[in-house]
């Protein structure tokens, strides 16, 4: 049996060269620079939609579709021309999306009589959550379409969720917001879309 005395059990550090320290510091700086640049790249990409014609899509209504054709009907952006539109790209598994859903529902209820249509665009794949169950569980009343193929998300340059896209009556993108957006900001953007 082997025994170890206290002097032998101490931790010995390998000597570090200044090169190693500088390399580690360099990696940290590159990482921090990346954190600063990546959001700007995404914002630029999405911001490039602002002022342009809204990308077209044709997606199936999966929940709360009575007001615009009934569940199972196809919804296109062309059908909605003449009305301001708030598109909410989200997924059932996304905690920030769950937090924003009641805000979007409140906006839908407040603005529906002013010519605004709110549409939730579920980005779940077929093996993820059920948007109908999500709508029921969260008391959502606005129409929800499903983007199973991801084509709509790609055409709108959706890189993260939740993302809101505000569209004017003339079919131009007014704003794109990623992350939880408060109701005052959404209402300000919708007013812009109606003006």
Residue ranges, per PLM feature:
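Structural microenvironment flanking redox-active thiols in thiol-disulfide oxidoreductases
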Residues: 98-138, 148-155, 188
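A short beta-strand-turn-helix
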Residues: 57-85, 108
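Active-site acidic short loop of glycosyltransferases
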Residues: 80-83, 113, 140-141, 158
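Short pre-active-site segment immediately N-terminal to redox-active cysteine/selenocysteine motifs
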Residues: 83-85, 89-93, 160
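N-terminal targeting signals for export/organelle localization
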Residues: 1-66, 195
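Thiol/disulfide oxidoreductase modules built on the thioredoxin-like
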Residues: 133-141, 146-193
């Amino acid at each position: 049996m082997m025994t170890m005395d206290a002097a032998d059990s101490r931790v010995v550090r390998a000597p570090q060269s200044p090169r190693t320290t500088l390399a580690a510091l360099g990696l940290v700086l590159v990482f921090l620079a990346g954190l600063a640049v990546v959001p700007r790249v995404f914002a630029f990409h999405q911001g490039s939609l602002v002022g342009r014609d809204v990308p077209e899509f044709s997606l199936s209504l999966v929940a709360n579709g009575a007001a615009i054709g009934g569940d199972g009907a196809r919804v296109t952006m062309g059908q909605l021309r003449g009305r301001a539109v708030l598109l909410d790209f989200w997924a059932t598994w996304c905690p920030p999306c769950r937090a924003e859903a009641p805000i979007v529902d409140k906006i839908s209820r407040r603005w529906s009589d002013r010519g605004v249509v709110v549409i939730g665009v579920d980005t779940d794949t077929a093996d993820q959550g059920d948007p109908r169950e999500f709508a029921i569980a969260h008391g959502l009343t606005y129409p929800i379409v499903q983007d199973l193929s991801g084509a709509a998300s790609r055409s709108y340059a959706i890189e993260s969720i939740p993302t809101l896209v505000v569209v004017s009556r003339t079919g131009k993108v007014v704003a794109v917001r990623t992350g939880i957006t408060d109701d005052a900001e959404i209402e300000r953007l919708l007013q812009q879309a109606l003006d």
